Amino acid sequence: MILSDADIRRRLDEGDLAIEPLDDPELQVQPASVDLRLGREFLEFQRANISCIHPTSEREVDEYVDETYVEEGEEFVLHPGDFVLGTTKERVEIPPDLIAHVEGRSSLGRLAIVVHATAGLCDPGYQGQITLELSNLGTAPVALSPGMRISQLTFTELKSPAERPYGAERGSKYQGQTGPQASRIQGDREFGGDQ
């Protein structure tokens, strides 16, 4: 069952679902979602002469990105074809009986801005800010401002709570993240890690 605005407000009031800071619930809580705002931090991928990035090499992944901070009131311009990692301003805590889905806002989609490439899911038990995989699929640059509503978070109630929620065991490499996080795929078991 997808949670309605009344369900979302009730879960927030009960404290088992947390979204902080939720500065303007009247504006941010929508009929079946919560609007999340854009944070100030971005990871920009360098336009370098790199023949190939090996996702399993933490050094190569780290060398490929630059951190950028944008103050509220200023703009981050996302150019056509660009891909950057951003973050939500809000930190979320998802209880074991809910799963959350990150979606773009239709108003930004109509400007050709997408907020996730593949990672649109927040597992039960996840805690932290949400990394956004921002792309401009259009033909004109688009200015994004920290604090603007950038995405929607919807919640689906599970038939039963997760037995092993995110953060309880291995495989929780993004638990508690602050700011955008580059890939940590090198920590996956199939690549020699313990995740």
From Swiss-Prot:
Question: EC number(s) for this protein?
Answer: 3.5.4.13
Which GO terms are recorded in the biological process aspect for this UniProt protein?
Answer: dUMP biosynthetic process; dUTP biosynthetic process; nucleobase-containing small molecule interconversion
According to its UniProt record, this protein's enzyme class is: hydrolase
* Listed Basic and acidic residues bias regions: 160-172, 186-195
Binding-site residues, dCTP:
105-110, 123, 131-133, 152, 166, 173, 177
Comp. bias intervals (Polar residues): 174-184
Q: Which PANTHER family match?
A: DCTP DEAMINASE
Q: How does it assemble?
A: Homotrimer.
Q: What is this protein called?
A: dCTP deaminase
